[in-house]
Amino acid sequence: MSLSNKLTLDKLDVKGKRVVMRVDFNVPMKNNQITNNQRIKAAVPSIKFCLDNGAKSVVLMSHLGRPDGVPMPDKYSLEPVAVELKSLLGKDVLFLKDCVGPEVEKACANPAAGSVILLENLRFHVEEEGKGKDASGNKVKAEPAKIEAFRASLSKLGDVYVNDAFGTAHRAHSSMVGVNLPQKAGGFLMKKELNYFAKALESPERPFLAILGGAKVADKIQLINNMLDKVNEMIIGGGMAFTFLKVLNNMEIGTSLFDEEGAKIVKDLMSKAEKNGVKITLPVDFVTADKFDENAKTGQATVASGIPAGWMGLDCGPESSKKYAEAVTRAKQIVWNGPVGVFEWEAFAQGTKALMDEVVKATSRGCITIIGGGDTATCCAKWNTEDKVSHVSTGGGASLELLEGKVLPGVDALSNI
């Protein structure tokens, strides 16, 4: 989708206005303590811009976890986020115990100039997602009239709307698409994400390499299919490589992942690659394990030797890493989505680590390197490479859907310019 024609915060006049801003404060928590504040830090530039440019108030709304429309303040309250945000901004943050209704509307109607207000978890109301569960765990759907009322209440909390929650941009939830204000702008985090992906997908530097890992082919079919129209080269690694190798080389894969559904379209994908002149690199050797366990016995295998019965491939081997490194060396732009081994376990992390080192090297020579969120972003955090690549996406699902060529509802809902 073209992202260049949407209103962004830098073009929005906020002076004297109440800004209602959707952010992504869905942070990991342990015993009500925030374990990683990256998402809160990522929203600070947009909040500060509004305050520095004379906004009357900034009202922040977010979800946290999956309470499914049931208020669970003990488990999923955003109150700890207000404390963290106060220390990051160096100013008071007023926390409200709900996100809609007369009391919230009153608190946000005429606040002191320069106020920052954080609302309670949007997903304590089933009207945010449109569906959820009741207190006994039965599935429930929100009533259309109540969804309308929920959206109308959110719309009363500001004069202008800013969406900086890229991580939720693929969800057509009330706070993402249902706030009815004349001006709806993308915040700076949203803008950074969309700019990177727009550049990557609409006018890429070439040669353009996609590195696609992860487990199931079926989950990545749309991704592979869409990227085959855009890239010059593609590495297909991780668990899904075994489905390709079994179909194409009749390789013995032991008990490695095999995706019956995905297997049916491997040949179609390969013929599309050939038609488009895309060079595909698959792994040629593997680190194997006698069971899916961190402390499993390990072995080696190649495509030619096959993987023995009862064993499975959990990482690529050194020859594969060499081939991957050659592809990285040729590239001027790289998009990476999905690890190439079970990186969480030391014995099977080497392939992904070696590839990360190559991608970092490529970045330092001027290659544009984009890490699609999720597991690959976790790899960056694990090996401390977040500032050694061009861009690490904050949205796993959202970045995946952009790379699949889908329209993101949260972006679509912003004002056109």
From Swiss-Prot:
Keywords: Acetylation, ATP-binding, Cytoplasm, Glycolysis, Hydroxylation, Kinase, Magnesium, Metal-binding, Mitochondrion, Nucleotide-binding, Phosphoprotein, Transferase. It is an enzyme of class 2 (transferase). AMP binds at residues 215-216, 220, 239, 313, 344. Its main location: cytoplasm. The modification Phosphotyrosine is found at residues 76, 196. The modification N6-succinyllysine is found at residues 6, 48, 191. The modification N-acetylserine is found at residue 2. It comes from Pongo abelii (Sumatran orangutan). The modification N6-(2-hydroxyisobutyryl)lysine is found at residues 97, 216, 220, 323. It catalyses: (2R)-3-phosphoglycerate + ATP = (2R)-3-phospho-glyceroyl phosphate + ADP; L-seryl-[protein] + ATP = O-phospho-L-seryl-[protein] + ADP + H(+). This is Phosphoglycerate kinase 1. Its EC number is 2.7.11.1, 2.7.2.3. InterPro entries: Phosphoglycerate_kinase, Phosphoglycerate_kinase_CS, Phosphoglycerate_kinase_N, Phosphoglycerate_kinase_sf. Mg(2+) binds at residues 215, 218-219, 375. The lineage of its organism: Eukaryota, Metazoa, Chordata, Craniata, Vertebrata.
